Amino acid sequence: MEQAPEDQGPQREPYHEWTLELLEELKNEAVRHFPRPWLHGLGQYVYSTYGDTWEGVEAVIRILQQLLFIHFRIGCHHSRIGIIPQRRGRNGASRS
């Protein structure tokens, strides 16, 4: 029977340290794009649902990633990423 290879040395970075760094980066980015009361409400919701646990940290990361992805995809005015409506000439004609 095949077995998974054994761990070939130490991890590059501990999971919890990496997770907290990712959370900090996402929070800093979210503050630039969303109102603070919304983010505070998100934090309150996650805390009331998960308490002070790693599942809560992972939930905040997952939700912030989804919010930022959608925000950029729709067309953030702070970013070059996203869908930006094309300007059209009169009667919808495009300039080719």
UniProtKB/Swiss-Prot annotation:
Pfam assignment, any one: VPR
GO CC annotation terms, alphabetical: host cell; host cell nucleus; host extracellular space; virion component
Modification(s) after translation: Phosphorylated on several residues by host. These phosphorylations regulate VPR activity for the nuclear import of the HIV-1 pre-integration complex.
Compartments (UniProt record): Virion; Host nucleus; Host extracellular space
Assigned keywords, A-Z: Activator, AIDS, Apoptosis, Cell cycle, Host G2/M cell cycle arrest by virus, Host nucleus, Host-virus interaction, Ion channel, Ion transport, Modulation of host cell cycle by virus, Phosphoprotein, Transcription, Transcription regulation, Transport, Viral penetration into host nucleus, Virion, Virus entry into host cell
Region described as Homooligomerization: spans on this chain: 1-42
Residues that bear Phosphoserine: S79, S94, S96
Predominant cellular place of this UniProt entry's protein: virion
Keyword Cell cycle: yes
GO terms (BP aspect): DNA-templated transcription; monoatomic ion transmembrane transport; protein homooligomerization; regulation of DNA-templated transcription; symbiont entry into host cell; symbiont-mediated activation of host apoptosis; symbiont-mediated arrest of host cell cycle during G2/M transition; viral penetration into host nucleus
Complexes and interactors: Homooligomer, may form homodimer. Interacts with p6-gag region of the Pr55 Gag precursor protein through a (Leu-X-X)4 motif near the C-terminus of the P6gag protein. Interacts with host UNG. May interact with host RAD23A/HHR23A. Interacts with host VPRBP/DCAF1, leading to hijack the CUL4A-RBX1-DDB1-DCAF1/VPRBP complex, mediating ubiquitination of host proteins such as TERT and ZGPAT and arrest of the cell cycle in G2 phase.
Family: Belongs to the HIV-1 VPR protein family.
Extra facts: HIV-1 lineages are divided in three main groups, M (for Major), O (for Outlier), and N (for New, or Non-M, Non-O). The vast majority of strains found worldwide belong to the group M. Group O seems to be endemic to and largely confined to Cameroon and neighboring countries in West Central Africa, where these viruses represent a small minority of HIV-1 strains. The group N is represented by a limited number of isolates from Cameroonian persons. The group M is further subdivided in 9 clades or subtypes (A to D, F to H, J and K).
Role: During virus replication, may deplete host UNG protein, and incude G2-M cell cycle arrest. Acts by targeting specific host proteins for degradation by the 26S proteasome, through association with the cellular CUL4A-DDB1 E3 ligase complex by direct interaction with host VPRPB/DCAF-1. Cell cycle arrest reportedly occurs within hours of infection and is not blocked by antiviral agents, suggesting that it is initiated by the VPR carried into the virion. Additionally, VPR induces apoptosis in a cell cycle dependent manner suggesting that these two effects are mechanistically linked. During virus entry, plays a role in the transport of the viral pre-integration (PIC) complex to the host nucleus. This function is crucial for viral infection of non-dividing macrophages. May act directly at the nuclear pore complex, by binding nucleoporins phenylalanine-glycine (FG)-repeat regions.
Protein name: Protein Vpr
Gene name in the database record: vpr
